């Protein structure tokens, strides 16, 4: 793909998300979602391998179904209220349909099956875009209509997503699938909280994007495709291994790292609203995710799998020996620094919530 075409597609992805964020009209909101989806498809199949194309087709089919459901909701709303305004409340039928459509776009249970396969079939950078930027537009729609949705249903789907994300990642050895199930679990945390506090959910989404960016950039820099690659990282790059451990533990939510803020402010919000059972189930579900986070950390820092010397040296490719500053390196440094020094930012986040 020519570089100019790629830049135009990236600009359209950004523009589609901005249209959704600034929309007060159902039709322009739907147009923004479609611009976002259609522009990301050529980027997903950038390398044009069979696996990339397969993932792009899966993503297109899922997003097409979701867009069709959203369009049906838009038409029903316009027919009922003779208005395209987002301020009009949803009824019971359109509320359920909108929950289903947003669940498909966000990868919530029970509409999460497509997400790990799509992430596994694309590169790390494309997977990062799907896990972070592509969540912003549907999350904005969720914020617009959250007052009309069934909060109990949304919280239940969020809890089940946390459990499924933790359970699904236990048996995985491919790093991209582990990150995909981790993303499902984190989106479950955010959706469980958004019905009780939109500001808390927005802060959680920003924190998740920062932490996930550091993990994906690091995995892309060292080409960590599986747990066996992680086990060889610390032998040749101690700093990289230590950075991966800190980023993974931050993603798992261990204090005093930045990821702890996601769990802390969510539990604080739920307890203040009297949702003690919901908070307890979320904590137990996060323990499942923490298990495979710790497994990655142990493989990176404490253990080294037995292997032949030829296998070890074949892993040391030239891509890890390039010098100079790159945009990816700058983004990695910034996101890793924030994700590692989380409690330094705690007063800022508390002031944002008050």
Curated annotation (Swiss-Prot):
Annotated protein name in UniProt: NADH-ubiquinone oxidoreductase chain 2
A Pfam family per the record: NADH_dehy_S2_C
UniProt xrefs under PANTHER family: NADH-UBIQUINONE OXIDOREDUCTASE CHAIN 2
Species in which this protein is naturally found: Patiria pectinifera
EC number(s) stated in the UniProt entry for this protein: 7.1.1.2
Catalytic activity line of the entry: a ubiquinone + NADH + 5 H(+)(in) = a ubiquinol + NAD(+) + 4 H(+)(out)
Membrane-topology annotation of the record: Multi-pass membrane protein
Annotated Gene Ontology cellular component terms: mitochondrial inner membrane
